Amino acid sequence: MAIERTFSIIKPDAVAKNHIGAIYNRFESAGLKIIASKMVQLSKEQAEGFYAEHSARPFFGALVSFMTSGPVMVQVLEGENAVLANREIMGATNPAEAARGTLRADYAASIDENAVHGSDAVESAAREIAYFFSADEVCPRTR
């Protein structure tokens, strides 16, 4: 199996409800290592840049507004098949459709406030990691 890196955001709704520790526990319990992490308050420009691929979609304005409504936790996760592993931990985008025991089933209120973001591919993970972290902020864990 391939050791990969993926990018994750704990969104403003989950941060406001103090779910950071519980979500980190889920990552680590699934064998993912947190190799970079920080809390940030996204500016409108940062949110628009990060979600630029959705700029033509009708929900874009609401997404940017939500993502700038409070601080978020951004983190880099590393582990075997990390992209897929994190997506399985997160569950379906719509929490009403998310499998029981997934982050979105347990911590999300709606499809709009769905607690977490995770990269959908190794390539997007690399781009998203670089958007928030410099190379010297990522600390591989070899033990």
Swiss-Prot record:
PROSITE patterns associated with the record: NDPK, NDPK_LIKE
- Substrates-to-products reaction catalysed: a 2'-deoxyribonucleoside 5'-diphosphate + ATP = a 2'-deoxyribonucleoside 5'-triphosphate + ADP; a ribonucleoside 5'-diphosphate + ATP = a ribonucleoside 5'-triphosphate + ADP
Report the HAMAP family cross-referenced here.
Answer: NDP_kinase (MF_00451)
Identify which cofactors the protein needs according to its UniProt entry: Mg(2+)
Which PANTHER family does this UniProt record tie to the protein? NUCLEOSIDE DIPHOSPHATE KINASE, NUCLEOSIDE DIPHOSPHATE KINASE DDB_G0292928-RELATED
The protein's Enzyme Commission number: 2.7.4.6
Source organism (scientific name): Shewanella frigidimarina (strain NCIMB 400)
The record's listing under InterPro entries reads: NDK-like_dom (IPR034907), NDK-like_dom_sf (IPR036850), Nucleoside_diP_kinase (IPR001564), Nucleoside_diP_kinase_AS (IPR023005)
Enumerate the active-site residues: H117 (pros-phosphohistidine intermediate)
What GO terms fall under cellular component here?
A: cytoplasm
* Subunit note: Homotetramer.
The record's subcellular locations are:
Cytoplasm
Record function comment: Major role in the synthesis of nucleoside triphosphates other than ATP. The ATP gamma phosphate is transferred to the NDP beta phosphate via a ping-pong mechanism, using a phosphorylated active-site intermediate.
Give the protein family. Belongs to the NDK family.
Q: Which GO terms describe its molecular function?
A: ATP binding; metal ion binding; nucleoside diphosphate kinase activity
Q: Where does ATP bind?
A: K11, F59, R87, T93, R104, N114
Record-linked Pfam families: NDK (PF00334)
Q: Which UniProt keywords apply?
A: ATP-binding, Cytoplasm, Kinase, Magnesium, Metal-binding, Nucleotide metabolism, Nucleotide-binding, Phosphoprotein, Transferase
BP-aspect Gene Ontology terms = CTP biosynthetic process; GTP biosynthetic process; UTP biosynthetic process
Protein name, UniProt field: Nucleoside diphosphate kinase
